[in-house]
Curated annotation (Swiss-Prot):
It comes from Mus musculus. Keywords: Glycoprotein, Glycosyltransferase, Golgi apparatus, Lipid metabolism, Membrane, Signal-anchor, Transferase, Transmembrane, Transmembrane helix. This is Galactoside alpha-(1,2)-fucosyltransferase 1. Residues 1-8 are cytoplasmic. The lineage of its organism: Eukaryota, Metazoa, Chordata, Craniata, Vertebrata. Catalyzes the transfer of L-fucose, from a guanosine diphosphate-beta-L-fucose, to the terminal galactose residue of glycoconjugates through an alpha(1,2) linkage leading to H antigen synthesis that is an intermediate substrate in the synthesis of ABO blood group antigens. H antigen is essential for maturation of the glomerular layer of the main olfactory bulb, in cell migration and early cell-cell contacts during tumor associated angiogenesis. Preferentially fucosylates soluble lactose and to a lesser extent, fucosylates glycolipids gangliosides GA1 and GM1a. It holds the Pfam family Glyco_transf_11.
Amino acid sequence: MWTPSRRQLCLAFLLVCVLSAGSFFFHLNGGNFFRNGLTLSVLCSDYHLLKSPVAMVCLPHPLQTSNGSPSCPEQSSSLSGTWTITPGGRFGNQMGQYATLLALAQLNGRQAFIQPEMHAALAPVFRISLPVLDPEVDSLTPWQHLVLHDWMSEEYSHLEDPFLKLSGFPCSWTFFHHLREQIRREFTLHNHLREGAQYLLSGLRIGPAGIRPHTFVGVHVRRGDYLEVMPNRWKGVVGDRAYLQQAMDWFRARHKDPIFVVTSNGMKWCLENIDTSHGDVVFAGNGQEGTPGKDFALLTQCNHTIMTIGTFGFWAAYLAGGDTVYLANFTLPDSEFLKIFRPEAAFLPEWVGINADLSPLQAQFDPWKPDSLFRLV
């Protein structure tokens, strides 16, 4: 008669224990595995990249640090469905898309996922937490599509589609301001960017006497393609020399020993047009649009902000806090831009607007000018 050895008995006992534990775990959590089909996915920690075919995968941060937070938050059992947004535009645009997706998904009880392209744009700069949508799942999901306009509407509070792909270029505080602290956490700089910006700022001095500044004012001057787009497409202007002078004087009148830290994608123009006679202006940005992290970090580590136009300046001001001066009324009243842009939804009520000088545009589009009459004929 065969008698099992002690080793065989131990192995059999261990096998029974494993099967029992697995059965208990399945019955305890099994409903959670398949409740939402494609929406419920295997989520990975920040330092794991799963190789097996799973519904959703979190990509690792390209700049993983010991103090980095996980990119995949614990998923709330109250959230269902799968929402995402089509990334588009540049750095500030994608920040607006990220924040709007997060806010609308929470408002409607849905789980938000970002596209790999958005993760690649934002994760090198911020410790973002939204998980990343696997491309294969993206291609198989029966999406409903919604193009967002750039202000919060009541209809966005009652969106019932469980699989929704948003699009557009939302960047209005009306979507996410009620979650301001959460948004600030999402857009927390990686330590090396924050510390690098603070190191640069700590070494700045005012004038020949080397006065240590009491107040740091970040200045973002948007130029680049806007020099053509604003006047030719939108009947608008960008911030000019006179506007920047007024904005700086506004801060000089209200803050002791301010220093102005200028960043721009048109630094040559800034060097030639910004008045440096007070000895309180520093041209610190590198203007590299492909790697915006350093310029953005500098702006957000300042106490206050001067912005011209654009989402990059908006986000710098929003995250820096403090006082913000912005360029107001920068288009003609009949501009098509005002059909997609509402100033009251773009700028916080406490921010200070300085009206743009529209006289060059008014002369250009004056219907009674001889060349305008010639065009009409």
